[in-house]
Amino acid sequence: WMLQGNRGDEQRRFQTEAEEVLELSPQDRNAWLIEALGERIKQNLDDPDTWLHRARLYVERQAWDEAANDYVQVIDLSQDIEVSESIRTAARVELAALPELFRRVVELRPDASIPWIGRGQYRALRSQWEESQSDYARANPTRAITDETFAYAGLSLLTDDRQGYEQLCADLVTRDEDLKDGYAAYVAARTCSIGPATAVQPEQLVEWASRAVQQNQDAWLLNALGLAYYRAGHLQQAIEALEKSNAGRWKRLCKAQNGLVLAMAHHSAGRQEEAQQWLQQATVTIDEARPKDASKPAPAYADDWIALELLRREAEGLIRPNDTADSEEPQSDQ
């Protein structure tokens, strides 16, 4: 970052300074960098990246109050839609991992969504469903129709808040203007299919998902379309969409969502051998990815990890009812 925006002699001067800084002790280097970033902040108060760099340096010193003040600046500046999503993501992840910092930041900005979403994701990836739902609820996850909307809906199901899930989906149906956007339509289709919601007609799910796929045929959009077709009883179309999703670019673990729905679709079509094969393949993939250490995160986005848990429960209950009835193993958050 020291060399950004500098040219010629100025860049060479900064290069020399950088080499000198590397020779300092870690503590002195930290202090030098904090001071240098402070000068840069004075020149441009509106650069969240610089605030974030300095916040991390304060964290290294365990200067929690100073770090919290800088993270608050990052949060405030992140309200600008032009700010890179990577900045928001970094702030969410870093705040969630440091309780001392998180506490101070939410005291300063109790209504900011970034800290709560970050900790909700942190907890969801450790299968701490109830704690995660509580955090997402603080973030107003339905204000905009995003992956956080889906995550909160899924967490409501995982914590047996079926009424809350149904109300969320009923509210989505009324947001016609928002749902003209392909991404919002995808989120709505996925959200209301995962239950599925009784408040939404199955053909409406297909319409929303199709709207998204018309704009882009990414694997995750096709997954939502396949699930919507399955909910509407269009089994062959569901299978075709899910197989097309499997052929696209998506992480193997994420594609296990396709496998679980394919298992249910083949089961509903009377093809039990195929259903068992898809279910076995998907569950093995999930089990291989699940961290053995419960304090470690699953290697997925929070919304995908939530979807995998819900779809697995449903598929196993449908295809292996005796196994699920006999199993008394608690979920990791129960």
Model-derived features with residue positions:
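TPR/TPR-like (Sel1-like) alpha-helical repeat modules
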Residues: 1-6, 68-80, 140-144, 157-175, ...
